[in-house]
Design a protein with these regions (language model features):
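Residue-level detector of alpha-helical segments with a strong bias toward transmembrane helices
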Residues: 116-117, 150
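Noncatalytic accessory or regulatory domains flanking protease catalytic cores in secreted, cell-surface
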Residues: 1-53
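Residues that cap or initiate secondary-structure elements
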Residues: 48-50, 110, 125
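Acidic, Ser/Thr/Gly/Pro-rich low-complexity segments that form flexible
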Residues: 31-35, 47-85, 102
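Hydrolase catalytic cores
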Residues: 123-186
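Active-site-adjacent substrate-recognition loops and nearby beta-strands
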Residues: 1, 67-86, 92-115, 127-139, ...
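Residues within well-ordered beta-strands of beta-sheet-rich folds
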Residues: 39-45, 90, 118-120
């Protein structure tokens, strides 16, 4: 497109992703302040093809405007960093009233046939403290994570503080949380 510059960054494997990543950034050129709107078509022509598969991800919502998106997107591949990493406990949100996956919650697979998130917790219409006092209802994975964080803290208290298992932390806590989770047909 006229008036646009494309920046390519060839990444290396990282703690978040063992695959080769290529970062593409489209920025306004010259004295423009905005990127031209419309439908963009990207054509990739590799010099050498290893497996022929590629995925595109966009930055999270805070970094783009609400009209930016893929023409045809895949809702089953909506994870963001750091949820793609192997070791962190990744938490999704679900609606406890309907026992359904929250539409705003990321999901998908990462490399090596691993799927994420690891657990789901209530994250829709959660009653919580409001700024300035009182209570309010909020939705989001930020409301689901405290359920899992509190459970992890209780497990660690039982194991480490109470002397029942001095190695009950990290991946062991994650394994116990996953094993103890209630399965549902919804996801």
């Amino acid at each position: 497109q006229d008036g646009m510059e494309i920046l390519w960054y060839f990444g290396e494997p990282s703690p978040y992703q063992i695959l080769q990543e290529i970062y593409l950034e489209i920025i306004p050129a010259y004295d423009r302040t905005m990127i031209q709107g419309g439908i963009w078509k990207l054509t990739l022509t590799p010099k050498q093809l290893v497996d022929g598969r590629f995925d595109f991800w966009m930055p999270s919502g805070a970094q783009i405007n609400e009209e930016t998106g893929f023409l045809v997107s895949e809702s089953a591949l909506t994870l963001t960093i750091p949820s793609t990493a192997r070791r962190p406990i990744t938490v999704a949100a679900y609606d406890a009233n309907t026992d359904t996956y929250a539409p705003f919650s990321g999901r998908g697979y990462v490399c090596c046939n691993r799927s994420k998130p690891d657990l789901a917790a209530p994250g829709v219409d959660i009653l919580s403290c409001a700024p300035g006092g009182g209570y309010t209802r909020k939705s989001g994975t930020s409301m689901a994570c405290p359920f899992v964080t509190g459970s992890a803290a209780l497990l660690m208290q039982y194991g480490i503080i109470s002397g029942n298992d001095s190695y009950l932390y990290g991946q062991k806590v994650k394994a116990y949380l996953i094993r103890g989770a209630r399965r549902t047909r919804a996801f």
